[in-house]
């Protein structure tokens, strides 16, 4: 018997994606818009957030009923071969644009990289977690909080908001506007992976569904052993559940893969220099 007074984390496999669990559906909340509409008014912001959370619950419960009905009618024959029920499946709620929410709420005095911003984001995520515990007790179904990938949603939210609220603070420029994913730091904020880890550790631990911190290494990782030691250091000193390590590289049409970031290919430059020297010597 599951204790519905606590939020569970998916077990087994990468991101807990074992065959007996998953998400019934995902609702992503546009946090940036809340920050703009209720700037400086925390009470109203939380009131509106609650309204959106209740709408999310209603939507996800209706979807669960619909999927169960389709399953019972035999319209998911392949699923029925390996899945006996949906009781271990989560109703998932996620957030997008937490960084821009803080910037709009504070009129650009803070963002998610400041201590004030981190504390505010943590307060909001904890509030969502508490509401989800209530939803679990009320419905008997599992809920989780996820850093939804929002690859398309982040652009769509920003585009819609720009039409309605021309003065809203967003990331990007011109046509390439977007909101920073979930509660991540701005993409251009730091190249130091340990600074990113310190800024994100508390917030990453608030999620009970899928979340990951991508660490882009501006310097070359010299060997698999060096990467292993780096990962060991991270998991020994930080609590966040998932990380990826991506070395920065460049691709030359002639010489292919090059370690590090290069505006111009150094191998091509060497060839050009040699050719120039030969011409000058002749």
Summary of predicted features, one role per range:
Residues 1-87, 108, 114-118, 122-282:
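Conserved catalytic cores of very large enzyme subunits
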Residues 91-104, 126:
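Contiguous, well-ordered alpha-helical segments that form the cores/surfaces of helical PPI scaffolds
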């Amino acid at each position: 018997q599951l204790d519905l007074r606590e939020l569970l984390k998916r077990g087994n496999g990468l991101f807990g994606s074992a065959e007996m669990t998953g998400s019934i559906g995902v609702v992503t909340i546009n946090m940036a818009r809340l920050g703009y509409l209720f700037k400086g008014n925390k009470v109203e912001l939380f009131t509106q957030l609650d309204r959106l959370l209740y709408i999310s619950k209603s939507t996800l419960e209706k979807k669960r009923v619909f999927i169960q009905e389709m399953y019972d009618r035999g319209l998911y024959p392949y699923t029925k071969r390996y899945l006996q029920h949906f009781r271990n499946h989560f109703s998932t709620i996620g957030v997008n644009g937490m960084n821009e929410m803080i910037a709009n709420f504070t009129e650009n005095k803070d963002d998610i990289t400041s201590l004030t911003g981190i504390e505010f984001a943590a307060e909001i995520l904890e509030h969502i977690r508490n509401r989800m515990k209530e939803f679990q007790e009320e419905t008997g179904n599992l809920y989780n909080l996820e850093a939804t990938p929002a690859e398309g949603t982040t652009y769509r939210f920003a585009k819609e908001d720009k039409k309605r609220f021309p003065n809203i603070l967003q990331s990007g420029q011109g046509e390439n506007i977007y909101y920073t994913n979930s509660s991540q730091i701005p993409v251009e904020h730091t190249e130091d992976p340990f600074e990113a880890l310190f800024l994100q550790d508390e917030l990453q631990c608030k999620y009970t569904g899928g979340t990951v911190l991508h660490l882009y290494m501006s310097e070359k990782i010299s060997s698999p052993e060096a990467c292993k030691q780096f990962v060991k250091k991270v998991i020994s000193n930080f609590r966040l559940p998932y990380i990826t390590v991506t070395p920065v590289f460049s691709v030359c049409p002639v010489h292919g893969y090059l370690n590090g970031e290069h505006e111009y290919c150094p191998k091509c430059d060497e060839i050009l220099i040699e050719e120039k020297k030969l011409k000058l010597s002749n």
